[in-house]
Swiss-Prot record:
It comes from the Eukaryota. It catalyses: D-glucose 6-phosphate + H2O = D-glucose + phosphate. InterPro entries: Glucose-6-phosphatase, P_Acid_Pase_2/haloperoxi_sf, P_Acid_Pase_2/haloperoxidase. The lineage of its organism: Eukaryota, Metazoa, Chordata, Craniata, Vertebrata. This is Glucose-6-phosphatase 3. Hydrolyzes glucose-6-phosphate to glucose in the endoplasmic reticulum. May be responsible for glucose production through glycogenolysis and gluconeogenesis.
């Protein structure tokens, strides 16, 4: 693996030196590939365009990120920003690279979660768009263009993760391929109109299974906090190592989102049928609400309190998008019945 890691560092160095003018593009691409962007940015937009596809986006995002966490616990995987210093191989001639605010994620590196979740979620969206365009226009060229744009977007997300030193190239490729396979598989079973008990059990199963697996690995002598220690040691700025990028934060986000999805469908099973203009208003209000929810600060001590509140925070997201905001807009725009 050492040779693979060396080549990855050289590629990151070359990418930073030769595309410095594209730094803003890479940072935006990395942000758009963040698993939480699938929940906070992509889900509302898709949901107000097509309800079932929006639910599929949330479902696939949660399950693919959870599986990514399990894979990382099994495969470990270094990250470039800490491996450069930890390996001791570059003491004489360190690579000319820099870290960024989004570099210092504290979980293991393989496979890339950004690549895996993004490729899974956007497969659901692009394949749905391609099916729609094929049905209404009969144009295979348009479908091909959509899949080409999908590939270009994934390429940008993957390169951005290498550029900011968050992942090695082989970790990105592994994440992209695994994500596409998950997108194809999970799209077949979208839990629309499933009972609340289904989501409650699924949410608790994700939490329970991950915690049991974590405990078993620790019992065998595997220290799963190794990556957090390395992140704190080698990140160039300590404030860039945040609890919301830790593995247990991902776990609680996924479980919270699924429980919230169940609650949203329980409160209003069929949702509201709104015309295009009210749906646009819903999107604007939801985006504003989710912006403030995502930025709401949580106490980081004790950790159990942080993770519990993090779970609740993301369980609110589907309810805001699917129930609270559409219900409010429905009340505002509904025409009074004539007697």
């Amino acid at each position: 693996m050492e040779s693979l890691y060396r080549q990855g560092v050289w590629m990151a160095e070359a990418l930073q030196q030769n595309s410095r003018s594209l730094e803003d593009l890479w940072l935006v691409a990395s942000h758009m590939g963040d698993p939480k962007a699938a929940v906070l940015l992509v889900f509302p937009v898709v949901f107000y365009i097509h309800r079932r596809t929006g639910i599929a986006v949330l479902w696939v995002a949660a399950l693919s990120e959870w599986l990514n966490l399990v894979f990382k616990w099994i495969l470990f995987g270094e990250r470039p920003y800490w491996w450069i210093g930890q390996s001791g191989l570059f003491s004489e001639k360190p690579p000319e690279v820099q870290q960024f605010q989004s570099t210092c994620e504290s979980g293991p590196g393989s496979p890339s979660g950004h690549a895996m979740v993004t490729s899974a979620v956007w497969w659901v969206i692009i394949s749905s768009l391609a099916s729609f365009s094929q049905a209404y226009t009969g144009s295979k060229i348009l479908s091909a263009v959509l899949y080409l744009l999908y590939a270009v977007f994934l390429g940008c997300v993957g390169l951005s993760r290498i550029f900011i030193l968050a992942h090695f190239p082989h970790q990105v490729v592994a994440g992209l391929l695994t994500g596409v396979l998950l997108g194809v598989f999970l799209k077949r079973s979208v839990p629309e109109r499933r009972p609340l008990l289904f989501f409650f059990r699924f949410s608790m199963a994700l939490l329970g299974a991950a915690l049991i697996f974590h405990a078993v690995l620790e019992k065998t002598g595997i220290d799963l906090s190794w990556s957090i220690s390395l992140a704190k040691r080698w990140c160039s700025r300590s404030e860039w190592v945040r609890m919301d990028t830790a593995p247990f934060s991902s776990l609680n986000r996924d479980a919270g989102v699924l429980l919230g999805l169940g609650l949203a469908q329980y409160w209003k099973p069929g949702g509201w049928t709104l015309p295009r203009a009210p749906r646009t208003l819903c999107l604007a209000l939801s985006s504003l609400a989710l912006h403030y929810i995502s930025r709401f600060p949580l106490p980081t001590v004790p950790p159990l309190l942080f993770y519990s509140l993090f779970f609740l925070k993301y369980s609110i997201v589907p309810q805001v998008v699917m129930v609270l905001v559409p219900g409010f807009v429905h009340l505002l725009t509904a025409k009074p019945k004539r007697e």
